[in-house]
Amino acid sequence: MSDKIGLFTGSFDPMTKGHVDLIERASRLFDKLYVGIFYNREKSGFFTIEARERIVKEALQHLRNVEVITSQNELAVTVARRLGTQAFVRGLRNSQDLDYEANMNFFNQELAGEMETIFLLSKPVYQHISSSRIRELIAFQQDIAAYVPQSVIKELERINDEKN
């Protein structure tokens, strides 16, 4: 029997505790779960891809069946096929996420009909946390520790140390 392989993608700019929770839950559904840090052309980047990779790897190091990858110039379906993935895993916080993901799923099915998409609902405690809100809090120098893994705080400290 072949391994069940999933792919959870995002820009993770920055990663939130909601992301970590979804990935932990998804990791229990697969033999191998890839977490793909993808460059999103519709979003302006706060952290570099390299910084995001450090953040995500540290936040997920306790998950033995999870491997973090990055991609800047490929469609998720191309990466998924190369990795032998059977399913995309996506998190849903609200109806706006569902609308966005339904549109993405349409194109994923058009391009890679053999792949399934599994939607996991965010836990209520994480439904109002978004990377864009976290970036706004960072811009106004607010405490974000309740919303992000410690690796985000460490990366911000590293960036501040480099500036000083």
From Swiss-Prot:
Homohexamer. Belongs to the bacterial CoaD family. CDD domains: PPAT (cd02163). ATP binds at residues 11-12, 19, 91-93, 101, 126-132. InterPro entries: Cyt_trans-like, PPAT, Rossmann-like_a/b/a_fold. This is Phosphopantetheine adenylyltransferase. Its cofactor is Mg(2+). It is found in: Cytoplasm. It catalyses: (R)-4'-phosphopantetheine + ATP + H(+) = 3'-dephospho-CoA + diphosphate. GO terms for cellular component: cytoplasm. One of its GO terms (biological process) is coenzyme A biosynthetic process. Signal peptide: none annotated. Its EC number is 2.7.7.3. Reversibly transfers an adenylyl group from ATP to 4'-phosphopantetheine, yielding dephospho-CoA (dPCoA) and pyrophosphate. The record marks 19 as: Transition state stabilizer. Coiled coil: none annotated. PANTHER family: PHOSPHOPANTETHEINE ADENYLYLTRANSFERASE (PTHR21342:SF1). GO terms for molecular function: ATP binding; pantetheine-phosphate adenylyltransferase activity. Keywords: ATP-binding, Coenzyme A biosynthesis, Cytoplasm, Magnesium, Nucleotide-binding, Nucleotidyltransferase, Transferase. Substrate binds at residues 11, 43, 76, 90.
